[in-house]
Amino acid sequence: IIASHSQGSLLARRILKKFFDGKPLQNRLIAAYIPGIKILKEDFTEIKLMTNPEQFGGFVSWNTYKRNKLPKNYDLWYKGGVTSNPISWDSQKKIDNEFHLGLLYFDNKIYPKSLKIELIDGMVWTTIPKVPNRFFIILASFLTKKGKDFHFADINLFWEDIKQNSIVRINKWKEINQIK
């Protein structure tokens, strides 16, 4: 599994292209979780976008922003980018909070059912998470982009969803490859 964010996702994309895409090592790739930058399907020739929660050998990516808001440079930085659903891991465009497995908050606790999301072209729109002292998450988003940008939490918002999905993908890969 390759997991990265933002500048790390820039590096992960280069590593995937150079060492995995269409190469023997691709058979060992379970999943690449590469949020925080604009990723295009065309960035890879053989590594495909994963569109169901058990699929392996591909990648997922997303960029998180406050619902009903668009960044100033939306067309350049987000539009046209891959937008995976980091809760259902399929093509559902809207997910209610009851399906959210949990975010990792600053108190090091997991808070399930704390946000709703909607996928648009190049972005995941989210509600402000329902967590204790949510003032801190609102403050952090204001310090970045006037309360709209949740880039700083692309991973934390979906922490438990990513964790559980990676387990599903690992188990499926092991099953198909007959590894105990």
Predicted regions and their residues:
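Surface-exposed patches in mature extracellular/periplasmic domains of secreted proteins
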Residues: 1-2, 174-179
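Surface cap/lid and interfacial helix-loop subdomains adjacent to catalytic sites
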Residues: 18-168, 172, 176
